[in-house]
From Swiss-Prot:
It comes from the Bacteria. This is Protein translocase subunit SecA. It comes from Blochmanniella pennsylvanica (strain BPEN). ATP binds at residues 90, 108-112, 515. The gene is secA. GO terms for cellular component: cell envelope Sec protein transport complex; cytosol; plasma membrane. It is a peripheral membrane protein. May bind 1 zinc ion per subunit. It is an enzyme of class 7 (translocase). It catalyses: ATP + H2O + cellular proteinSide 1 = ADP + phosphate + cellular proteinSide 2. Induction: Repressed under conditions of excess protein secretion capacity and derepressed when protein secretion becomes limiting. This is regulated by SecM.
Length: 911
């Protein structure tokens, strides 16, 4: 009997069904046009692209009006080039992707070709389409495979891969459709906002992004920011010393536990992945630090002077206890390579932050690289929200539909499969111990091999995959292993995982991107042949049909999960490798009470129930209730991870607003040839600020304040003004300080105009832009570091009954305002130091000795960096140099000091 809710749903349909019903009408229109499109010859079909583009340019039609006809053209082109006719469900997927939504399409439903539909349509506007994949292999494969289609239709295709030169990247982005990875798109965006010449940028705007495996990129990797960094101070020796001390404490703690002693030095919180020192642990580490000379007698590890030491100690404990080799990372060629916890892939070039990577390098006794300082950063969440139009596709999105909507404003639409799903998903089997579970898995594999059924075994770490591999080797079962150690042969291994009796062990199947075809991949076999004649091809196809039939008879691909992942979505991705395109298949997960998910997150009720049953060694429980209990534990973890990602975004949104302001201002600077008006406005603000600092009251009450202002103008702006004399001569200035302010501004402006006249407007403009851009970058880098420090400690405000998020927003805004004020001050200060005396009106502007060939403006404590030399610009403008500056001449910087006492001193130090 139908419940009222089910009856209501049956009559009115759910939202997903209603959306698909509406889109089905568009599919009917595409099918209706198919006959007319089929009548066109190749030339007429290809010319449709120009016809569509003219319609858009003239404003007669927009993309939505063109969709049915454009999709019909792409479908017919695919049929002619690849001999494949797109299913109606693929057309539905294309419509969903064009509608700023996420399309959930099951494995094997043809997502790669589906993506060509919205990619073609959106490329017609000429603004570029970015197709985003999870790795370089997929980006290259999809671009090469789809290139014949797009080129037939008159569109260009680019591939954006790491290691390409700027000109090659620029060419890739200029193409109508660009394939690349999420990392590369994000890093290119950050690099583009660090250039000094507009022509050095590679991207041409963020119009439309279509993300493959969207859940992997927008959810799994949402907590990992993209960071461009530079080297910081060398602290490798300190990491090594602290590593030895922490290792000795861990060993001592282990001995205490083995000897049943109650004294513990630290506790481990696996849920929050933290190691917490106990009172005894704190006393011991302080004693060891003092004994080794790292800390002074009588000091505390928690004193403000030792915050960095505490940071190193925490990193060392986490490295030893929470991070495991061949689970979280690999050691290869003297390097620590991070393993992606979601995909099982190695991530070369990635490094953990906060000193953790250095702590792991110390733990594994490899070369410890310097810590890095952030130069620019952005999260994937905020990067992809910069696109005007965003969509994505994956086989598993519905479980994360709420997060997609709440964070990215993307609805999730589930596309029905072309054929009914007939895979048999068996209930989970749970054992008491890990050993019993492994035994049961091996027995299941043996049974499958006996009946010639292919098996895919999914593990969550390299360590687990090698345990299974070792057990299979001992009983003589041939198998292949796919993990971070052997990822180079990934596509070949997966392509042939459907062979009769094949056993494939894979670590985290998420995002592998290659379908498992029952009977093996005959196309891959043909491609592997150097010279494929018709007879060989026919034999390969004939053999494949026999193998395909044998696999179907044995039950199709059997998927074994060695434990549940934290996310149900990853489990569904593993299961989804079986039962593609209506194929028969099966899946089962084997669990034990020692699995981390059950041990950390499962409810006490489940654990107690297992104990009460009094299970004997080797016994197992198989019941839907167990599966539901595990799913509930996974949901708890998913909700917790969602809260973490949401909180991360809320904090990053603060930095993102500031990043947007900085990048917009920087972009504006790059595109203006003459920024003298900007300098003029900034100069007014700086003089106003100076007065507010040194003479805050309405009237001048203290001559000492005026003297300090006078000293500041001379030191920071090379402006010698007799302010005290002016006041003595004109007593009214005591009360009318606005007149004094205006006079200072006029003198500063006159000095500036004089400098422009001497140097030349073009050179001065180049200087000003260079100074402003470099000051932007240096202060932004320091601001990011300050924001990071603020973020790390802001949670402590909660103890004072204050909202940490509101406090973070308030303080970061205050810091940002101060940074902008500092920026103005530094720019005007540096520009003011560019005063150059005219030695010869008709000859050169600046002449120097051979040693003095790298004249630079004075470094300040804040900038601590060298600005581009005047000589560089003079050479660019073909100015000659033939007069020598002697040691006793006035320094050409305009400081009125002798050259030997000013920049001559700097030159001598440098040489």
């Amino acid at each position: 009997m139908l419940t009222p809710f089910k009856l209501f749903t049956k009559i009115f349909k759910n939202r997903n069904d209603r959306v698909l019903l509406r889109m089905k009408k568009v599919v009917d229109m595409i099918n209706y046009m198919e006959k007319d499109i089929q009548k066109l010859n190749d030339s007429q079909l290809a010319s449709k692209t120009n016809e569509f583009r003219k319609s858009i340019e003239s404003g007669v039609k927009n993309l939505e009006n063109l969709l049915p006809q454009a999709f019909a053209v792409v479908r017919e082109s695919i049929k002619r080039i690849f001999n494949i006719r797109l299913f109606d469900v693929q057309l539905l997927g294309g419509i969903v992707l064009n509608s700023r939504c996420i399309a959930e399409m099951k494995t094997g439903e043809g997502k790669t070709l589906t993506a060509t539909l919205p990619a073609y349509l959106n490329a017609l506007s000429g603004q570029g389409v970015h197709i985003v994949t999870v790795n370089n292999y997929l980006a290259h494969r999809d671009a090469i495979n789809n290139k014949p289609l797009f080129e037939f239709l008159g569109l260009t295709v680019g591939i954006n891969l790491p290691g390409l030169s700027a000109s090659m990247k620029r060419a890739a982005y200029t193409a109508d459709i660009t394939y690349g990875t999420n990392n590369e798109y994000g890093f290119d965006y950050l690099r583009d906002n660090m250039v000094f010449v507009p022509e050095e940028r590679v991207q041409r705007g963020l119009h439309y992004a279509l993300i493959d495996e969207v859940d992997s990129i927008l959810i799994d990797e949402a907590r990992t920011p993209l960071v461009i960094s530079g080297p910081s101070d060398d602290t490798s020796l300190l990491y090594s010393k602290i590593n030895e001390l922490v290792f000795s404490i861990i060993q001592k703690n282990k001995r205490n536990i083995d000897n049943l002693q109650k004294e513990e030095y630290f506790t481990v919180d696996e849920k929050s992945r933290q190691v917490i020192l106990t009172e005894n642990g704190l006393v011991l580490i302080e004693q060891l630090l003092i004994k080794s000379g790292i800390m002074n007698q009588g000091e505390s590890l928690y004193s403000s002077d030792n915050i960095i030491l505490m940071h190193h100690v925490n990193a060392a404990f986490r490295a030893h206890i929470l991070f495991t080799c061949e689970v979280d990372y690999l050691v290869k060629n003297g390097e620590i390579l991070i393993i992606d916890e979601h995909t099982g892939r190695v991530m070369p070039g990635r490094r953990w932050s906060d000193g953790l990577h250095q702590a792991i390098e110390a733990k594994e006794h490899v070369t410890i690289q310097n810590e890095n300082q952030t130069l620019a950063s952005i999260t994937f969440q905020n990067y992809f929200r910069l696109y005007e139009k965003l969509s994505g596709m994956t086989g598993t999105a519905n479980t994360e539909a709420f997060e997609f909507q709440s964070i990215y404003k993307l609805d999730t639409i589930v596309i029905p499969t072309n054929r009914p799903m007939i895979r048999n998903d068996f209930p989970d089997i749970i054992y008491m111990t890990e050993h019993e579970k492994i035994e049961a898995i091996i027995n299941d594999i043996k049974d499958c091999v006996k009946r010639n059924q292919p098996v895919l075994v999914g593990t969550i770490s390299i360590e687990k995959s090698e345990i299974i591999s070792h057990a299979l080797s001992q009983i003589g079962i041939m198998h292949k292993v796919l993990n971070a150690k052997f990822h180079a042969a990934e596509a070949d291994i997966i392509a042939q995982a459907g062979y009769p009796g094949a056993v494939t062990i894979a670590t985290n199947m998420a995002g592998r991107g290659t379908d498992i075809i029952l009977g093996g991949n005959w196309r891959a076999e043909i491609t592997a042949l150097h010279k494929a004649n018709t007879c060989k091809i026919l034999k390969i196809k004939s053999d494949w049909k026999k193998r395909h039939h044998a696999v179907l008879k044995s039950g199709g691909l059997h998927v074994i999960g060695t434990e549940r992942h934290e996310s149900r979505r990853i489990d569904n991705q593993l299961r989804g490798r079986s039962g593609r395109q209506g194929d028969i298949g099966s899946s089962r997960f084997y669990l034990s009470m020692e699995d981390s998910l059950i041990r950390i997150f499962a409810s006490n009720r489940l654990v107690n129930m297992m104990k009460k049953l009094g299970m004997k060694s080797g016994e197992s429980i198989e019941h839907p209730w167990i599966t539901k209990a595990i799913a509930h534990a996974q949901k708890k973890v998913e909700n917790r991870n969602f809260d973490i990602r949401k909180q991360l975004l809320e904090y990053d949104d603060v930095a993102n607003d500031q990043r947007r302001v900085i990048y917009e201002q920087r972009d504006k600077l790059l595109n203006i040839s003459d920024i003298s008006d900007i300098i003029r406005n900034i100069r007014c603000d700086v003089v106003e600020k100076l007065f507010n600092i040194y003479i805050p009251l309405e009237i001048i009450e203290n001559k000492r304040d005026v003297m300090k202002l006078e000293e500041c103008l001379e030191k920071d702006f090379c402006l010698e003004l007799p302010l005290l004399k002016w006041i003595e001569v004109e007593p009214r200035l005591y009360e009318e300080k606005e007149i004094l302010r205006q006079r200072i501004l006029e003198n500063m402006t006159q000095k500036y105009e004089h400098t422009r006249k001497i140097i030349g407007i073009d050179i001065m403009c180049s200087f000003e832009k260079e100074i402003m851009l470099r000051t932007f970058d240096v202060l932004w880098k320091e601001h990011l570091a300050s924001m990071d420090y603020l973020r790390q400690g802001i949670h402590l405000r909660g103890y004072a009954q204050k909202d940490p998020k509101q406090e973070y927003k308030r303080e970061s805004f205050s810091m940002f305002t101060k940074m902008l004020d500092h920026l103005k001050y530094e720019v005007i200060s540096e520009v003011s130091k560019l005063v150059i005396e005219l030695f010869n009106k008709k000859e050169s502007i600046l002449n120097s000795t051979n040693k003095y060939n790298d004249f630079q403006s004075i470094n300040t404590q804040v900038m601590n960096t060298k600005l581009l030399s005047i000589d560089h610009f003079l050479n660019q403008h073909t100015l000659t140099k033939n007069k020598t500056v002697s040691r006793n001449d006035a320094c050409p910087c305009g400081s009125n000091k002798k050259f030997k006492e000013c920049h001559g001193k700097i030159v001598n130090k440098r040489h």
